[in-house]
Amino acid sequence: MIRSRQKVLSLVTWTLKRSIVVNAVSASSVDPSFSTMANTTNVAANTNLNKTTTEPGNIRNAPQLSILQTLENAEFIALGTPPTLLTVHSPPSVPLFVRRGALTSIYGLKSTSNTTPTYGSSSSSSSSSSSSSSTATSFTSSLTSSTQPLIRNTLEFPLWWDRFRFNGGHILSYQKLISTVPFSTLISSSSSSLSSSSKYGDVKSFANLILDGSSDWAILNKTAIQAYTGNSLSISMHKLPKYISKSLAKFLNISRIETGLWSFWNSGYTLLSGRGHVGVVGSGGVYQLQLAEDEEILIRKSAILGVTVNGPFDLENCIIKNDVTTTLYLPQEGEQNHKVKVKLNVEERPQGKQVLVQPSAWDQIVLGSKLALNWTRLVWHYQKVFFNRISIILSRFLLGNAEFVKVVGPRNILIQASPHLKQTQKDTRRSFGGSNSEEITQLNEKLVFIEPQINPESGSKSKSNDYLSYVEIDPKKGAVFQNTPNFRDSI
C-alpha cells in the first residue's frame, strides 16, 4: 500500500511539472517578448540598485563641463560671474603651465578597467637636465601598461633669475602638465602658494589672451600670469624703461621725462610674443580698453594689468608719468632761488701799504639785516618744501591719489578694477626723485654777489675809494671780508 501511494504521488508531481513547462512554451510561442521582458525586468532592477548618476536636468545653476576627446588647438574658457575659474582643454604633446596651487581638477581622461594609476618621482633625463633652473616632481598614470605615460606633472621655475632681478626677489613656480592624449583642467584664479596675494582679501578674475603673432603683450603685474600654453609662445622678462623715448619726447614737444613705471621693487615686466593662449588674473574685475591713434588716457599705474606693444622696446613710446598730486603742490616760480646782493662803497687804496678796511656801523647793520633776511628766506623755503611733501603723502594716503601715468594710443589696455596699494605705498617716497621734485628742492649756492660802486676822482694821486673790497657770507663762519685788486679772479 505504501509503495502504491508513493508511485501515485510521483506520477502527480511529474504531471504538474510537465503542465508548467507546456504552459511556458505555449506562452512564449504566443508572445515571443515574454522571455525578453522578464530578462529586461531583472536587468533594470539590478541597474536601479547600482545607479550612481542622475539626470543633468536635476542639477541647476551649475554649467556642465565639456569633455573633448579629439582636439588640435588649446581652448581657454572662463567660468562664473565674475570669472574665477578657468577650464582649459589641452591637446596632446603640448605642455600646459599652471601656477602652483591653482590647479583644481584634471578630467576628461579615458580610462580602462585593467589600468591602475601609479605615482612616483620623475627620473627622466629631461628633468635632470633642467635641475639647475628648477626642481621637478612628477606623477604618471598609464592607459594600457605601467610604462606608457598618460600625464606628466613637473614643478618648474621658469625665468627664475630674471624674476629675481627684476621683481625684487619674487620668484613664481608653475606646474608643467603634458599628456599623450587630450585632457581638460580646471584652474582657480587664486593660488595657495606663499607668493600669492590672497591675504589682501580681494577677488581675482580671469581674462584670456589669444596671441596670433600680430602683436605682443607687456604684462606689468608680476603675479598676473596664471596659466599659459603654446609651442610657439615666447615669454621673456625685460627691464622697465625709466625715461620716455626721444621720438615720443619730440612728438609731444617735451623733454625726456620719466615713464613712471620703474621702481626699485619692481623694475621689470613680462613680454608675451608668438602664438599661444595665456590666462591672466586681476584683482576685482578685468576690463579692456582700446585707444585710437593720438588718443590719451590718464590711468593709475597699479591698475594697469597689461598693454599691447610692438617689441620689447615699445613700452617707452606709450607711457608717460603724470603725477597729479605733485603738480598741484608745485611752488610758484621765483620762490626757489634767493640771492643776496650786498653793495659796499669802494674806498681808495693808499699807496705803499695795505690798509684793513673796517666797515662802518651802518654797513654792519645793513649787512646783518640782509644776512638775517637771507636765512629767513631759506628757512621759509625749506619749510614750504617739507610741508608740501607731507601734504602729498597725506593726500595719497587719505584720498588714494597714487601715481598716475598717461598712455598714448593706439593701444589695448587691460585694467584691473581693485588693485591693492602695497606696491604703490612703497613707491611713495621714491616719487620725489623725479623731474618735478628737482624743480622744487634745488637751491642755489649760498654765495654773495657784489656790485661795486666805483667813484674814481680825477687826479694823479690814488685815493682810498680806488681800493676794492668784497664780503662773502659763509653759513659756518658768517661774514668774511676780503680785498682784491679786481673782481675777475674773485667773482
UniProtKB/Swiss-Prot annotation:
Residue span of the annotated presequence: 1-61
Predominant location: mitochondrion
GO BP of this protein: inner mitochondrial membrane organization
Entry keyword Mitochondrion: yes
Domain of life: Eukaryota
Subcellular localization: Mitochondrion
Keyword vocabulary terms for this entry: Mitochondrion, Transit peptide
Coiled coil: none
Any one Pfam family match given in the protein's UniProt record, by short name: AIM24
Region called Disordered, residue ranges: 114-133
This protein's GO CC annotations: mitochondrial inner membrane
Family statement drawn from the similarity comment of this UniProt entry: Belongs to the AIM24 family.
UniProt-recorded name of the protein: Altered inheritance of mitochondria protein 24, mitochondrial
Organism: Lodderomyces elongisporus (strain ATCC 11503 / CBS 2605 / JCM 1781 / NBRC 1676 / NRRL YB-4239)
